[in-house]
Amino acid sequence: MNSGGGTATAGEEMADYVRGFSERTGKPVVVSSASVNASAAYEISSQADYIYTAKTTAIGAIGTVMQVTDLSGLMEKLGISVDNVTSADSKDSSYGTRPLTEEERAYYQDQVDQINETFIQTVAEGRDMPVEDVRALATGLTFTGMTAVENGL
């Protein structure tokens, strides 16, 4: 594995596949970590029976991010105006043509929290660790291979 991650959905689906493969076949799944094994890539790897790593590999980055860019100020400076015609007030909230409202930001934060909880649960199950231990490691940062091993990742 040599990846900084990917999408939450792909990570979840591939983690399920890796876990299911081992259960269906009775064969162990072995992951060899290269330079980086992070985020969704680590979520997938966490389902393996064995994870091999170099001492200096970047492992972990357990966390979730959703980016909504507000380009409205830049568009205004460039003389670009956008009229969004929508079926609901929040339909254009992720288009970047206006700032998020407080309610929209709270909505997206709730989604991130739900997705992150799934990530944490998946890692806890795959590494046979208590959920609270994984949650404590879910800082979004990577660990060196040495520290990841010490932490049970």
Residue ranges and their predicted role:
Residues 1-27, 33-126:
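Small-residue-centered hinge/linker elements
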Residues 119-153:
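Secondary-structure end/capping motifs
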